[in-house]
Swiss-Prot record:
Catalytically driven reaction(s): RNA(n) + a ribonucleoside 5'-triphosphate = RNA(n+1) + diphosphate; ATP + H2O = ADP + phosphate + H(+)
EC id: 2.7.7.48, 3.6.4.13
Domain RdRp catalytic, chain residue ranges per copy: 1236-1343
Keyword Ion transport recorded: no
Official protein name in the record: RNA replication protein
Keywords: ATP-binding, Helicase, Hydrolase, Multifunctional enzyme, Nucleotide-binding, Nucleotidyltransferase, RNA-directed RNA polymerase, Transferase, Viral RNA replication
Positions annotated to bind ATP: G735, A736, G737, G738, S739, G740, K741, S742
Organism: Potato virus X
Entry-linked InterPro entries: (+)RNA_virus_helicase_core_dom, Alphavirus-like_MT_dom, DNA/RNA_pol_sf, P-loop_NTPase, RNA-dep_RNA_pol_alsuvir, RNA-dir_pol_PSvirus
SUPFAM superfamilies, per database record: DNA/RNA polymerases, P-loop containing nucleoside triphosphate hydrolases
Domain ((+)RNA virus helicase ATP-binding) ranges: 695-862
């Protein structure tokens, strides 16, 4: 499996990963559905892991809770296993609820029998009343089952059952018996159940829930060993067994076998007859336990508790490896090996016995006292067995030697969960046999039945009032009760009998009156509106109306308006008082409503006025079609230029109306005819189909189709090319966005429901989900994305929604490929954007859009929208009846929580990488409808077509917000000129105020930790493994032909040889470092790279801005802050020693070239643990010396931006700059989440990989802080034109720049947030190229597009945040107790100082570093693993033994 996993992990293509995940999800769904029956519960992570070990999957998204979910899941799983075994015929179930048959997947038609006896009081509530019997009766079926009860019964119960039920052949039984209870151990599955021992019994507690606990006697555990049960015939006398023959004995035997076992739950199969069964019965044992031999007297002073064998071996090897194993050291080692959470499982007495036993082992000699067979001559070897026999007898008489004692003392007794099966024989034990046949006492349930008689329950219902809201149903129910006489009448409420009325009739009457009032009110509003429209029509004039109506085309056949039947000449509508909100109260006020009679035009008058308005409309013949899609179309509207907007345009005459193909659902045909969208026969362009098929076959386009076999592509193109012509009936529906093109079709599909042969093909998955949500009562496979439809097939009727977004030639190819398609429905908008193919070698790239071909078969274009309000729609030249004003605004900042529209797909992916997941391109947002959208304007906007801009501007229903990403006003106006729609949408938005910096709260005082003791360890236990693989000096050194070997491995001390000593005077190492760390280029190439990475720098900055909480608008420049930062930089420089200042004279000279850099090799000891004793010395690090004025200028710039960064920085982000370990500890304790895995990020060649993209990021960051332009330009110059003695350096980071630390840190933050999708509130800590996060975030999909464009490569390190595995940051471990130095790295560094003889000089520093861990004392056992504890102990002992009597540091006085 490791190889398979390695192959899957090697896939880096996001599309391939998506396909793998999709395939995996399809496989997972039925599996999870299968396991849902037994395990529908929400499980803890630990319990879920245990259940997976038993083959039971857990749904991580389940939220169903249970008091003991894991134990209940195992119980359900055993019932599921039992259900697969039981025959499909009646079975007798004993002690089982009938509803549990669901877990067995039993057919409810099988007439199963239930025998439940109420043995305990709670059995009355547990079992249905109809299944409870007085006592167990004869079983009349071949198979029976006993549920979770057999372990409480006497073995003679099996004898009685099989003796009294001759038809019974097989008995299944489930038992709940924890095997470890036989050894009085703690639960081996503590996440499922726990155990408590009381005297001669114990309690099984599932999920630590006392309400579900069982009490067992230890005698119940005998059921774990039973293999066969034998008995004699009861008709014989008690001594009749003497006359038994073998045949008679065999007739009375049942065989017991373990069928399945999960934790403490077991399924037994008990079969009549003497059959074979395994001699040894084995139960699951997750860990290996042992018990020390009982070697002390009295026996009570021996350790009897089973202990993990691994722990015993660790303790044994410890006491035998240390020089002197003191009693306190052994106790400390035991404390180290036992988790704090497990300490309550041990008694202090048991620990004393264990330590005494280990101390005894430590005192014995391990050298053998016996002679060997290799020494001596022939005579000696001949007499050797005699000598050995004499020595053995001597030890038996006078006592064992130490070696023999040790061998016997370490002969641990294994705790094995395997038992030899036993046969229980009742044939030769008359008393036992009599006990087996005596009648069992069964609880009587007759009195309980009397307590819950039906009469008492029904009496409760007879007291219900007869005048309740649902009086009719209550009266019918009451009349059926036996307690009431047939002629008894229902009492009515007190009061006058004549005034009583049925509440239902009162409510209906009241509802009718309310509805009448609403109808009259709506009629009055309609009459008033018609009068206004009629007045408006008269103002338009007859001339214009006649001119426009002449171009409307032929009148459709169904253009007749519906006629109205005769009605009253006049309507009288009442004017009423406000109607109460609740109808229950209205009954008391209805009579008090005053009605004033108001004369309104009659129905006939209203219809006459309406008809007059319609007659004056240019589109009067199209009113029925407009009404069919929800438009009244009684108003004339005009665009910005004053031209009348026609709701119906682009009419095509001469198209014949074909009949719908056979099998077309009548609901669908009805809706299409109502819109005048009858089908027309369309001959397909086979050349377009062949171009698309060729591209798919050669894998030039597509995502899913590229994964298909080559044979499938050959079959696709072969079938298309074999056709000479292909015609199909098609309904082409064109209309503006939001015109309701799809609404009528969706309405028809909802009426059709499931079972239709219809497929809806959609261009995007978002649109597919939208259709699935709007038409929920159909099969989910009805809606497919276009590639899935091509691969998976379609129905005979295919609906293409937004077909302009499908690849050119796709529609023709699909119809040609599937000959069963007989009707297609195309919905789209010829005014909006169309599909754009980016693959340059694709044949379809040169095809025209599908709308161009199919437009000539579209009967008309519906130029009306329900989406946009009238003002916006009219600006776009579209008809709308939505009233109100569309809000338009513009600023340089983004709004949160609303979709973002950008001009390019590249920008969309990058914006999504910054967390804006609802980002769409102008063209890709087609089909989107949102109340608010924001449209980003940049240099790509001016190259967008009018169709694309129309698509973007028509998405919002209420508000459009424009975001100008450029600070250049002339560029902004150029963007506005790029489209005719933008100049009308201008507004001003106020800027946000700068938020103030809030200082962190003081660290709370914590209680001191309890004292502890660490066991003594071997001095070389940490470094020994590195020394074993150490090579010779010259095998490890770097060799150069011109300079010879390097000199990094020094002295003969193996400890010092582990560490590489890099020195500035080492020429070989210098040139190796220059070759590895520095790259040369030229100014022109550097500047070209800087410009080419502009878009990447933009994305890096957006991610950084979001991560650090910087304001959306630029931060105004503050001269006061700049001068303060410059003063700090100057003071810092002048604080150096005079000697250092003199050494820098050359770089202070005005003659020093501003672009020149002096490069040196950094002298250092390499103390990283991962680089100890490497087979080959690694190159060193360089230090760059710049012109001092340059360093101070850019140092001031970095400090200035740091000042503002700290003001806006979120509290969950910590930057280890000018802070103390105490500050970092306080922050970690308040913000870090230790309940999940964490991620630490490291980089390969971090400085050298900061190329033009990072420089672009730094420039944008500086501009956002309004750094003066001349300083920014100078920074660009020094980064692109830096000279060393070899030439011009490539763009990179150099140690020695002014902003090195801040720039590294901020680049680290930007890169991390660009790569990872980091959840809000995640704790993050940064310093230079080091970082750590308290979660493991997912890699953004957008990052895959940037990964190859960035030189920077990260190396994530995941830690589980548990004992021995904590996130590391700059040599510090972040733990639940605060930060502390990594004990292994601290010890390694200390050993180097000790080996060089410099420990006295730096002891104070090591004591301070050590104290951060030492202060936590006993808690270290929960933080450090065994190896870390060893390193910590050795560091403590080394410092204590260093010879210092006192320590001046107050915090370390208790320590030493």
């Amino acid at each position: 499996m490791a190889k398979v996993r390695e192959v899957y992990q090697s896939f880096t293509d996001s599309t391939t990963k998506t396909l793998i995940q999709d395939e995996a999800y399809r496989n997972i769904r039925p599996i999870m559905e299968k396991h849902k029956l037994a395990n529908p519960y929400a499980q803890t992570v630990e319990a879920a892991n245990d259940l997976e070990g038993f083959g039971i999957a857990t749904n991580p998204y389940s939220i169903e809770l249970h008091t003991h979910a894991a134990a209940k899941t195992i119980e359900n799983k055993l019932l599921e296993v039992l259900g697969s075994i039981l025959p499909q015929e009646p079975v007798t179930f004993m002690f089982l609820k009938p509803r549990k048959l669901n877990y067995m997947r039993r057919n409810p038609r099988i007439k199963d029998i239930f025998h439940n006896v109420a043995i305990e009081p709670r059995d009355v509530a547990r079992y249905p009343k109809e299944t409870i019997i007085d006592k167990l009766t004869e079983i009349t079926t071949d198979t029976a089952y006993i549920g979770d009860t057999l372990h409480f019964l006497d073995p003679s119960y099996i004898v009685e059952t099989f003796q009294n039920c001759p038809k019974l052949q097989t008995l299944y039984a489930t038992l709940v018996l924890p095997v470890e209870a036989a050894f009085k151990m703690e639960s081996t599955h503590p996440n499922i159940y726990s155990l408590k021992y009381f005297g001669d019994g114990f309690q099984y507690i599932p999920g630590n829930h006392g309400g579900g606990a069982y009490h067992h006697e230890f005698s119940h555990l005998q059921w774990l060993k039973v293999g066969k049960i034998k008995w004699r015939d009861p008709k014989d006398s008690f001594l009749g067994h003497l006359n038994y023959t073998t045949e008679q004995v065999e007739m009375h035997t049942v065989t017991v076998q373990l069928q399945e076992s999960f934790a403490a739950n077991h399924l037994y199969c008990i079969r009549r007859g003497d059959l074979l069964t395994p001699e040894v019965r084995t139960f699951g044992q997750p860990d290996r336990y042992v018990i020390p031999p009982q070697i002390f007297l009295p026996k009570v002073h021996n350790c009897k508790k089973p202990i993990l064998k691994k722990t015993m071996m660790q303790l044994f090897l410890y006491v035998r490896t240390v020089k002197v194993a003191k009693n306190c050291d052994i106790f400390a080692k035991v404390r180290q090996l036992i988790k704090s959470s497990d300490l309550d499982k041990y008694s202090a007495v048991e620990l004393v016995y264990l330590v005494s036993y280990m101390e005894f082992l430590a005192d014995l000699q391990a050298t053998t006292c016996f002679s060997d067979t290799l020494s001596g001559g022939l005579l000696t070897k001949t007499l050797a067995p005699v000598r050995a026999w004499i020595q053995e007898k001597k030890m038996q008489l006078f006592g064992l030697e130490d070696y023999a004692k040790l061998v016997k003392a370490v002969d641990f007794h294994p705790v094995d969960f395997s038992f030899k099966v036993e046969t229980w024989d009742f044939r030769f034990h008359p008393l036992q046999a009599w006990k087996a046949f005596r009648p069992r006492e069964v609880s009587d349930v007759e009195e309980m039945e009397n307590l819950f008689s039906d009469g008492d329950l029904l009496d409760c219902f007879t007291r219900m009032p007869a005048y309740a809201v649902n009086a009719e149903e209550d009266l019918a129910a009451i009349r059926k009760t036996p307690e009431m006489d047939a002629g008894q009448e229902v009492k009515e409420p007190a009061g006058d009998r004549n005034q009583y009325s049925n509440p239902a009739e009162t409510f209906l009457s009241k509802l009718h009156r309310k509805h009448s009032r609403e109808v009259k009110h709506q009629a009055a509003k309609k009459a008033k509106r018609l009068a206004e429209i009629q007045e408006s029509m008269r103002a338009e004039g007859e001339a214009e109306s006649n001119e426009m109506s002449g171009g409307m085309g032929a009148i459709p056949s169904n253009a007749e308006l519906p006629s109205t039947s005769g009605a009253r000449q006049e309507l009288t509508l009442p004017t009423t008082k406000p109607v109460p909100a609740r109808w229950e109260d209205a009954s008391f006020t209805d009579s008090s409503v005053e009605e004033e009679q108001v004369k309104l035009p009659g129905k006939e008058a209203v219809e006459t006025a309406t008809q007059q308005v319609i007659e004056g409309l240019p589109w009067k013949h199209w009113i029925p079609q407009l009404n069919a899609v929800g438009f009244k179309a009684l108003e004339i509207q005009r665009d910005r230029s004053g031209t009348m907007i026609m709701p119906i345009t682009e009419m095509v005459s001469g198209l014949e109306k074909e009949d719908f193909p056979e099998g077309t659902p009548k609901e669908l045909a009805r809706e299409l005819l109502a819109m005048n969208r009858s089908p027309a026969t369309i001959p397909l362009d086979l050349l377009r189909a062949r171009d698309y098929g060729s591209d798919v076959k050669n894998k030039r386009i597509g995502a899913i189709t590229k994964t298909q076999a080559a044979s499938w592509g050959e079959y696709l193109t072969g079938k298309i090319e074999s056709l000479t012509e292909r015609k199909v009936a098609a309904c082409v529906i064109h209309g503006a966005g939001g015109s309701g093109k799809s609404h009528a079709i969706q309405k028809a599909l909802r009426e059709i429901g499931k079972g239709s042969d219809i497929t809806v093909v959609l261009p995007t998955n978002e649109l597919r989900l939208d259709w699935s949500k709007k038409v929920p009562n159909t099969e989910p496979y009805m809606f497919k994305t276009y590639e899935k439809a091509l691969i998976g097939g379609t129905g005979s009727i295919v609906i293409f929604d937004d077909y302009s977004k499908l690849p050119p030639g796709y529609i023709e190819a699909l119809i040609c490929f599937y000959s069963k398609i007989k009707l297609v429905i195309l919905t789209g908008d010829s005014r909006q954007s169309v599909y754009h193919e980016t693959a340059e070698d694709a044949s379809i790239r040169h095809l025209g859009p599908a709308t161009e071909y199919f437009s000539k078969y579209c009967r008309y274009y519906l130029n009306a929208t329900h989406r946009n309000k009238k003002d916006l729609a009219n600006m776009l030249g579209v008809y709308s009846e939505r009233t109100g004003v569309t809000e338009i605004s513009m600023s340089a900042e983004f709004l949160e929580g609303i979709p973002t529209l950008v001009p390019s797909d590249e920008k969309r992916r990058l914006y999504m990488g910054t967390g804006r997941n609802d980002t769409f391109t102008y063209a890709g947002c087609q089909g989107l409808t949102k109340p608010k959208v924001q449209i980003v304007l940049d240099h790509n906007t001016q190259v967008c077509s009018a169709n694309v801009m129309y698509t973007a501007l028509s998405r919002a229903t209420d508000r459009i917000h424009f975001v100008n990403t450029s600070a250049n006003s002339s560029a902004f106006w150029e963007k506005l000129d790029s489209t005719p729609y933008l100049k009308t949408f201008l507004s001003v938005v106020r800027e946000q105020a700068l938020k103030e910096y809030e200082p962190a709260e003081a660290e709370p005082i914590r209680e001191p930790e309890p004292q502890t003791h660490m066991c003594v360890e071997n001095e070389e236990s940490v470094l020994e493994e590195y020394k074993e693989e150490l090579l010779e000096k010259f095998d490890r050194e770097i060799h150069s032909e011109s300079h010879g070997h390097s000199n990094c491995v020094q002295t003969e001390d193996t400890t010092i040889q582990l560490f590489s000593h890099q020195q500035a005077k080492d020429e070989t190492l210098l040139w190796a470092t220059i070759d590895a760390r520095l790259k040369t280029s030229n100014q022109e190439t550097n500047f070209r790279e800087f410009l080419s990475k502009k878009d990447i720098g933009d994305v890096l900055f957006l991610n950084y801005q979001k991560a650090m909480g910087l304001p959306k608008e630029r931060i105004p420049f503050s001269q006061e802050v700049w001068e303060a930062c410059a003063h700090e930089v100057q003071s810092k420089y002048l604080s150096k020693s005079k000697c250092n200042l003199i050494n820098g004279t050359v770089r202070q000279s005005p003659d020093f070239d501003e672009n020149k850099i002096m490069v040196f090799l950094k002298s250092q000891w390499v103390t990283k643990v991962e680089k100890l004793g490497l087979p080959k010395i690694k190159p060193g690090q360089t230090i760059a010396a710049f012109y001092q004025q340059t360093v101070m200028l850019f140092g001031t710039m970095a400090r200035y931006m740091r000042w503002f960064r700290q003001a806006f920085q979120p509290k969950e982000v910590f930057i280890n700059c000018e802070t103390t370990p105490e500050d970092m500890s306080a922050w970690a304790l308040n913000n870090w989440n230790f309940s999940r895995p964490s991620l630490a990020n490291d980089y390969t060649a971090f400085d050298q990989s900061q190329d033009g993209a990072m420089l672009q990021f730094e420039v944008l960051k500086a501009k956002h802080h309004c750094i003066p332009e001349e300083i920014i330009q100078a920074y660009i110059d020094i980064k692109t034109n830096a000279h060393i003695f070899l030439g011009t350096l490539s763009i990179m980071r150099l140690t020695g720049e002014g902003p090195t630390f801040d720039a590294n840190t901020e680049c680290n933050i930007a890169y991390t947030h660009t790569k990872f999708d980091i959840p809000a509130g995640t704790a993050q800590v940064y310093a230079g190229d080091d970082s750590a996060l308290d979660c493991v975030p997912e890699v953004k999909h957008s990052f895959h597009r940037l990964e190859d464009k960035l030189l920077l490569k990260s190396k994530p390190v995941i830690t589980q945040q548990k004992k021995g595995s904590w996130p590391e940051f700059c040599g510090w471990l972040i733990t639940p107790k605060g930060v502390m130095k990594d004990p292994i790295k601290l010890h390694v560094s200390l050993k180097l100082a000790e080996a060089k003889g410099e420990l006295k000089k730096c002891q104070d520093s090591y004591e301070i570093d050590l104290s951060y861990a030492y202060d936590h004392k006993d808690s270290l056992h929960d933080l450090f693993d065994e190896k870390q504890c060893q390193a910590h102990t050795l560091t403590c002992r080394t410092l204590i033994k260093s010879g210092r009597g006192t320590v001046s540091l107050p915090r370390l006085r208790n320590f030493l």
